[in-house]
Amino acid sequence: MNTDSGGCARKRAAMSVTLTSVKRVQSSPNLLAAGRESHSPDSAWRSYNGRNPETLNGDATYSSLAAKGFRSVRPNLQDKKSPTQSHITINGNSGGAVSPVSYYQRPFSPSAYSLPASLNSSIIMPHGRSLDSAETYSQHAQSLDGTMGSSIPLYRSSEEEKRVTVIKAPHYPGIGPVDESGIPTAIRTTVDRPKDWYKTMFKQIHMVHKPDEDTDMYNTPYTYNAGLYNSPYSAQSHPAAKTQTYRPLSKSHSDNGTDAFKEATSPVPPPHVPPRPRDQSSTEKHDWDPPDRKVDTRKFRSEPRSIFEYEPGKSSILQHERPVSVYQSSIDRSLERPSSSASMAGDFRKRRKSEPAVGPPRGLGDHSSSRTSPGRADLPGSSSTFTTSFISSSPSSPSRAQGGDDSKMCPPLCSYSGLNGSPSSELECCGAYRRHLDVPQDSQRAITFKNGWQMARQNAEIWSSTEEAVSPKIKSRSCDDLLNDDCGSFPDPKTKSESMGSLLCDEGSKESDPMTWTSPYIPEVCGNSRSRLKHRSAHNAPGFLKMYKKMHRINRKDLMNSEVICSVKSRILQYEKEQQHRGLLHGWSQSSTEEVPRDVVPTRISEFEKLIQKSKSMPNLGDEMLSPVTLEPPQNGLCPKRRFSIESLLEEETQVRHPSQGQRSCKSNTLVPIHIEVTSDEQPRTHMEFSDSDQDGVVSDHSDNVHVERSSFCSESDFDHFSFTSSESFYGSSHHHHHHHHHHGHFISSCKGRCPASYTRFTTMLKHERAKHENIDRPRRQDMDPGLSKLAFLVSPVPFRRKKVLTPQKQTEQAKCKASVVEALDSALKDICDQIKAEKRRGSLPDNSILHRLISELLPQIPKRNSSLNALKRSPMHQPFHPLPQDGAIHCPLYQNDCGRMPHSASFPDVDTTSSYHAQDYGSVLSLQDHESPRSYSSTLTDLGRSVSRERRGTPEKEVKLPAKAVYDFKAQTSKELSFKKGDTVYILRKIDQNWYEGEHHGRVGIFPISYVEKLTPPEKAQPARPPPPVQPGEIGEAIAKYNFNADTNVELSLRKGDRIILLKRVDQNWYEGKIPGTNRQGIFPVSYVEVVKRNTKGSEDYPDPPLPHSYSSDRIYSLSSNKPQRPVFSHENIQGGGEPFQALYNYTPRNEDELELRESDVVDVMEKCDDGWFVGTSRRTKFFGTFPGNYVKRL
């Protein structure tokens, strides 16, 4: 029933809310604080005369005062000092909004604060106004068609105050004020100034104001449910102006208060309840007034001031606001977040799927103090108790949602409802753990809450939990975290519980020890034992929660009072200390020389495995494995009921199951674990059933095959598996490094965090074997070949570390093994080198292969050539000879200092600098000739004619192409064969074997039978007519052609290898003149192309041999033999004084034509050492002369 300004009573179908502002400090920085001047009779006059049926129905087109002509005589409200502002509620369709102060409003976009339609029946209106007088004004928010409303601050500028227009606009219900054309004013204004609107909205969304400590101390948001009842004063206080526009001025919802919207499913609104006596005592207070509590809601805003202040899971504000408890419940976390439309709309969507639907609500009481439930006034203590619920569901829940009906507003959370003297004080867990939380009156707070749970700066109590029934949930989920987080910070350690299972404990445990599993903060309920937990399991399995409780139940009192730290070393030390106190060690730790019984170890380890397996598969645990929770301190210092130390568990079970072994099992050495040796005849198997697999209890027979220092490459799953299958398996033992490491891997188990069963099988056995290694000097077991084992580790992908051996005996053995290792490596590398050479000769080994790169990396870095490039050119031009005959018979070729004919001193037959394919061709072609010798191949490469220089520069095929004439037709049968006809000329490239040639015909290359062709003698060039040779004074000797020489001019003489030449005279130091006997061919030819075999006495003084230089640096090699008695023979021994002997360490392949080939262990006589690190010398093996890297040789 609503009453308009005229006093006429009329029925409404739409819901109406009457909001009465009280004396309040404004919490939003954007709203101006109201002063005393704002409460003028004008505002009161306008407030109570602006009610008409049209505005009551949402028709905010014009007011009744305007219709009666009162607009011209309205009071002047342009008080610039402190204009009064308020919040109004506007429907989702931008319906009529009213203001008690301002006649004009700025534009407001309906989409800016639009709310989901699913939350349409709950309206939460926070109000904060600074009013110093006792006068109050009413606001009325109307929702015509069930759409949502949002709080909009009103603002009045000076420009709008000066602008007064009276416009008669058509009436459109529900669209708000319109202009003369019928267009809503908000839409029109938004369209006219889109840029300003967007800029304003962007600033409002992204700006967070710092709270003002002086003005935001006493602002309490409260909640109204507009769909529950009709306000007795539902008339609209202030009519809407025709040119009203809407403009939100708050930076965020949290600045102006909290707008939290929740689903409302109550079908029937409760009847109206008369005001309570305490509310009627005040002249201005009514039953819809907010409670007389001053709560600083700004304290719950956890908006970080800077991104650098953000810490996940923490709130910098709440750190200063929670002086007593360091644990944040889910309610506190939800209150820390600013609410928004999106978070409110998505709160129910983000509810866990496993939670059942919310059950029918209990009528304990309504949420806010604006009203009470139907039967609440009749309950004992209801007049002095009001209910308040807080929202805490998911991280997306709104920040501060107070007020509203419990059936609508109470979220899925576990909270406690305890009415003093009320029969409905039992715990209730309906639906998704939803309960009502009653906040006692101020007079009873000190009695009810004795544990310091009150807020320092708040009078309202904020306490509940997400999944707990009675006590706050600890954040840590492992033993280590409990020790780190809880020491000195929790008021009573014995009341802490681990997880949901321990909180939702069964009936038996509650009856046996109610103080452990119930909250000490609710002594009324716990002392009377009247409440019983009724939990509806999220999982439909009946025994799920019971199993979950058994898996995670931990006695925290013993855990806190214990000195054991969650590390392997600490547990071992604690176990030893406990055993020493009980007198069970018998000099075990004191006497390290005592032998530990061998038969004790497998049994003891089996017991360990049994406990560890049970810890890993906790669902299989029985009731007998659960220790009763006791509050008494542990006796005998062992804490047998602690279930924290594996050693204590083992001690319990061994005393029960193995009384005879209980004494001996303590003899196991508890020193640091290392290696273990268990043979096949002592394979221990546990006497009890394994939960995972029986084979985990078997020790591997190959536990001693690998003796490698442990490394950290094993994953947790591998560690979890191999730690049980092998006591010293390479994977299992690799995870635990040494005993001084206080960190260890987590087990893969059903428990989160570190499980108490973190002491594994192999650590126990390795601990025992460490004692045996220290006490008994066993003979060294014969290992496999150390060289092979070293190679195996080198090529293996498994990382390893060599042990540091300190004993002299082992050092001697290591020294002995070093030679075999080096020998094995050297042999392997030699095989690799040979393989590379063979592959490179076949042309099948790319330069980027791994073997090639390996060899190149192992070889020394070749120094860059600089001064050695000119080392062979610095000698005088007239230093032609350096005879080096070996044994006086076979004379050595020397370099010739001919700059135009640089030799290719490549005597390396395996690798050619240009192409390995061509190097093979050279040898094949030379095999066709009858003059092949051991040096024929190298001689071919060191051919020093002009044509050789040309051919060496890129056309080596010209040298090896030998013409042949086809004597038969040959038709290719395969793609590799070469077809030709009789009479064709075929150029032979190389000889494949005794029956096949490879040749070229008409640009095609292929193979053909040797018998099908006949080699042709290359035609000699036609030499022009020349004058007859002069009369020879006489022959100076005889020589044999070493290489083929093709004449380029008509004065030169072409030579074939092996031709006998009569030397006529010495033209200069580089050229001879001679003739071939039996022919009329005569001409000059290079000295280096022939080998003098006979020298006559007369005629040889024309160009005498120069003396041997001290530092020979000639770049050409000559052959010179002399049988003159007066000339000494330069044998190999004669030149040793001229060079310093060096031995080659590595093979070196020449890269330039003046470089010398080196093979490993070659002896080289070094004549000169260049500044760039290159040496100049002669190889004693090949008798060639050239440069080579100095770091490839060592001094003999």
From Swiss-Prot:
<feature type="modified residue" description="Phosphoserine">
    <location>
        <position position="844"/>
    </location>
</feature>
<dbReference type="Pfam" id="PF00018">
    <property type="entry name" value="SH3_1"/>
</dbReference>
<feature type="modified residue" description="Phosphoserine">
    <location>
        <position position="354"/>
    </location>
</feature>
<protein>
    <recommendedName>
        <fullName>Sorbin and SH3 domain-containing protein 2</fullName>
    </recommendedName>
</protein>
<feature type="domain" description="SH3 2">
    <location>
        <begin position="1034"/>
        <end position="1095"/>
    </location>
</feature>
<feature type="modified residue" description="Phosphoserine">
    <location>
        <position position="394"/>
    </location>
</feature>
<feature type="compositionally biased region" description="Polar residues">
    <location>
        <begin position="235"/>
        <end position="247"/>
    </location>
</feature>
<feature type="region of interest" description="Disordered">
    <location>
        <begin position="929"/>
        <end position="958"/>
    </location>
</feature>
<feature type="modified residue" description="Phosphoserine">
    <location>
        <position position="592"/>
    </location>
</feature>
<feature type="modified residue" description="Phosphoserine">
    <location>
        <position position="340"/>
    </location>
</feature>
<feature type="modified residue" description="Phosphoserine">
    <location>
        <position position="589"/>
    </location>
</feature>
<feature type="modified residue" description="Phosphoserine">
    <location>
        <position position="27"/>
    </location>
</feature>
<dbReference type="InterPro" id="IPR003127">
    <property type="entry name" value="SoHo_dom"/>
</dbReference>
<dbReference type="GO" id="GO:0043025">
    <property type="term" value="C:neuronal cell body"/>
</dbReference>
<comment type="function">
    <text>Adapter protein that plays a role in the assembling of signaling complexes, being a link between ABL kinases and actin cytoskeleton. Can form complex with ABL1 and CBL, thus promoting ubiquitination and degradation of ABL1. May play a role in the regulation of pancreatic cell adhesion, possibly by acting on WASF1 phosphorylation, enhancing phosphorylation by ABL1, as well as dephosphorylation by PTPN12. Isoform 2 increases water and sodium absorption in the intestine and gall-bladder.</text>
</comment>
<keyword id="KW-0677">Repeat</keyword>
<feature type="modified residue" description="Phosphoserine">
    <location>
        <position position="478"/>
    </location>
</feature>
<dbReference type="GO" id="GO:0030425">
    <property type="term" value="C:dendrite"/>
</dbReference>
<dbReference type="GO" id="GO:0048471">
    <property type="term" value="C:perinuclear region of cytoplasm"/>
</dbReference>
<comment type="subunit">
    <text>Interacts with ABL1/c-Abl, ABL2/v-Abl/Arg, ACTN, CBL and PALLD. Interacts with ABL, CBL, DNM1, DNM2, FLOT1, AFDN, PTK2B/PYK2, SAPAP, SPTAN1, SYNJ1, SYNJ2, VCL/vinculin and WASF. Interacts with PTPN12 and WASF1 via its SH3 domains; this interaction may mediate the partial PTPN12 and WASF1 translocation to focal adhesion sites.</text>
</comment>
<dbReference type="GO" id="GO:0095500">
    <property type="term" value="P:acetylcholine receptor signaling pathway"/>
</dbReference>
<feature type="modified residue" description="Phosphoserine">
    <location>
        <position position="382"/>
    </location>
</feature>
<feature type="modified residue" description="Phosphoserine">
    <location>
        <position position="1113"/>
    </location>
</feature>
<dbReference type="GO" id="GO:0061049">
    <property type="term" value="P:cell growth involved in cardiac muscle cell development"/>
</dbReference>
<feature type="compositionally biased region" description="Low complexity">
    <location>
        <begin position="382"/>
        <end position="399"/>
    </location>
</feature>
<feature type="compositionally biased region" description="Basic and acidic residues">
    <location>
        <begin position="252"/>
        <end position="262"/>
    </location>
</feature>
<dbReference type="Pfam" id="PF02208">
    <property type="entry name" value="Sorb"/>
</dbReference>
<feature type="domain" description="SoHo">
    <location>
        <begin position="166"/>
        <end position="227"/>
    </location>
</feature>
<feature type="region of interest" description="Disordered">
    <location>
        <begin position="329"/>
        <end position="407"/>
    </location>
</feature>
<keyword id="KW-0472">Membrane</keyword>
<dbReference type="GO" id="GO:0019904">
    <property type="term" value="F:protein domain specific binding"/>
</dbReference>
<feature type="modified residue" description="Phosphoserine">
    <location>
        <position position="254"/>
    </location>
</feature>
<feature type="modified residue" description="Phosphoserine">
    <location>
        <position position="1119"/>
    </location>
</feature>
<feature type="region of interest" description="Disordered">
    <location>
        <begin position="25"/>
        <end position="57"/>
    </location>
</feature>
<feature type="modified residue" description="Phosphoserine">
    <location>
        <position position="343"/>
    </location>
</feature>
<feature type="compositionally biased region" description="Polar residues">
    <location>
        <begin position="83"/>
        <end position="92"/>
    </location>
</feature>
<feature type="modified residue" description="Phosphoserine">
    <location>
        <position position="397"/>
    </location>
</feature>
<feature type="modified residue" description="Phosphoserine">
    <location>
        <position position="130"/>
    </location>
</feature>
<dbReference type="GO" id="GO:0016324">
    <property type="term" value="C:apical plasma membrane"/>
</dbReference>
<keyword id="KW-0027">Amidation</keyword>
<dbReference type="GO" id="GO:0005925">
    <property type="term" value="C:focal adhesion"/>
</dbReference>
<dbReference type="GO" id="GO:0005886">
    <property type="term" value="C:plasma membrane"/>
</dbReference>
